[in-house]
């Protein structure tokens, strides 16, 4: 039996959702999505879906406390969570979200080092979720530098200046 079947930290999720992590704008401002879910809710869903519900009450309380600590911040208790998941899953578990929308569940699962996949009928949601939960977390250090040096910047300076003047002139006329 999974933890989510017996217990979910509703009060902690509600409290952390009011405060948010960091600026609160990073993930949610990338694109507008009609069902904006807090990151803490996704993290709680991932953790409680993967962790077992033990028979021993002391062990239940220990795991509940671990989940509560993990919900206090973006990277809170991640090392302890990784150790706990390694006890229960010899291979890295896969997390699949069949209606991922903005991709918050795959994002939080990926931040925990899990194999995460998000699926959605909407091509826009699929692209956005991939950009947020897949491409952003990849190691791009081996990619070649972009072929724009200072000369490339100079080519665009005049065009940018011209475009800004055009917009400001239009704003001034209105």
Regions from the PLM with identified roles:
Residues 1-174:
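S-adenosyl-L-methionine-dependent nucleic acid methyltransferase catalytic domains
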């Amino acid at each position: 039996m999974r933890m989510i079947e017996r217990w979910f930290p509703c009060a902690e999720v509600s409290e952390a959702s009011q405060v948010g992590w960091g600026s609160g704008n990073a993930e949610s401002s990338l694109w507008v999505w009609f069902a904006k879910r807090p990151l803490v809710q996704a993290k709680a869903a991932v953790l409680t879906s993967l962790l077992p519900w033990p028979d021993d009450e002391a062990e239940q309380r220990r795991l509940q406390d671990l989940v509560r600590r993990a919900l206090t911040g973006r990277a809170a208790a991640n090392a302890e969570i990784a150790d706990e998941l390694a006890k229960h899953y010899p291979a890295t578990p896969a997390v699949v979200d069949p209606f991922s929308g903005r991709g918050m569940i795959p994002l939080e699962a990926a931040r925990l080092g899990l194999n995460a996949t998000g699926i959605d009928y909407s091509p826009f949601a699929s692209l956005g979720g991939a950009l947020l939960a897949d491409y952003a977390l990849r190691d791009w250090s081996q990619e070649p530098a972009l072929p724009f040096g200072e000369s490339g910047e100079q080519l665009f300076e005049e065009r940018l200046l011209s475009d800004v003047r055009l917009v400001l002139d239009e704003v001034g006329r209105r």
